[in-house]
Amino acid sequence: VSYLKHAAQGLEECKQVLYLLGPVGGGKSSIAEKLKYLMQQVPIYSIKGSPVNDHPFCLFDVKEDGDILQKEYGIPKRYLKTIMSPWARKRLHEFNGDITQFKVVRVYPSVLDQVGIAKTEPGDENNQDISSLVGKVDIRRLEQYAQNDPDAYSYSGSLCKVNQGLMEFVEMFKAPIKVLHPLLTATQEGNYNPTEGFSALPFDGLILAHSNESEWQSFRNNKNNEAF
């Protein structure tokens, strides 16, 4: 509870993965299921049509708008630190900078619809890459858009789905180490890079990982994993 409270206040916990360590049958999955259930009870606000649940505050600049929003609406400046996704930035250019053209929707996270909640499991070294977390280009759209166009991208990765939500990473340390790298920047910096050459995608959510003790010991003893 203290972890979630401090993370919500923007303290150091918001830059950390919530990691559950324990033996098989110790209740790790039960805690994860309970958190996902609770997450579905409270709605989130996002820009209508955003494939990564862009928060409306991403349209404001903390330096230019921070004082006004705090004075007139009581919105703390720390809430304005989320970046705008490439998709939202493209829409902003199409609207000639008029943010009133954006619509805001109130959405309830859903496990079944994978809105704000997603589950990731480790795969084989040969068939799992970072696209399972960050998405990839949709080949079918390349007839209409350039490869580095935000509208040609498939935001199917777990990190894309869980902005403002919760991602459960089952047996995290069984995954190839290359797959885990986006988690570092997502938690530490609040954004991560897609597989194509456009700007970073926003992340403001909870990453919940769990594994048993033997997997953790093996992972920790490998000096190459020190950053994690």
Language-model segment annotations:
Residues V1-F228:
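Conserved ASCE/P-loop NTPase catalytic core
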